[in-house]
Amino acid sequence: MRRGKASAALPKDRAMVEEAHTRVRLGWPAALLFVSGTAALVYQVLWIRQLSLVVGVDVHAVSLGIGAFFAGLAAGGWLFGRLADRVERPWHLYAALEMAAGVLGLSVTLALGAIAVPFVWLESRVGPLAWLLPLLLVTLPATLLGGTLPVLMRALRPLIEQRGLAGGRLYAANTLGAIAGTLLAAFCFIPWLGLRGSALTAAVLNGLVAIAAWRLAARASAQAGTPGNAAPPAERAVAPEEAQEARARRARLAVVLYAIAGGLALGY
């Protein structure tokens, strides 16, 4: 009887150990996403401010800035999420995304400061199609930023039982960083540093995150003993075809419901 109780307690103890291990592993990645989220929302505040000067109407600038930014995040999550499953070194991909986002974010900020005259010229000739110019400028760096979370999740490769914990913690850290970025941009960076100085600060933050990610990649490779840090056997197991189809249906339903919820939230 005692032996049965002891054996029953083993899976529970193992689950607790795995959860504690996952929490420890999430420390640095969560910090990276916090800083990355801070930089991302600094850019967004700057771009909305600049777009209001370009298009001349605040509500249009806010709608264009938020719409283009979230379109980029969605495209980046879809594109780089698929790519992350194919690359051998997702940590390096994450570092490259952060570095490229910093360079492109700074470049777009400088470009938005110079497109007022071209925008007016285009609008007088092609009408509403002129809005594609600022839309594309904002969407491109946002696409890179949108790929950071799924790529980092792929780099961590949490156990199936810990994916909810890992995803929730990383998303929360990224959201908290976004809140910090919004407040810092509005109350500190823009008044003290101006638009270009604020964009440069955000780009530096992206660069620091990229450097830290490269160091974490080296540490992960050293611990695993291989450059790719091979995935655990539990993740390589292929589910039966019926289970895969059922999982795909649930995933599609979740995406639709999540999209509706996001649309309602941003509509308010």
Range-by-range predicted roles:
Residues R2-Y268:
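Alpha-helical transmembrane segments of multi-pass membrane proteins
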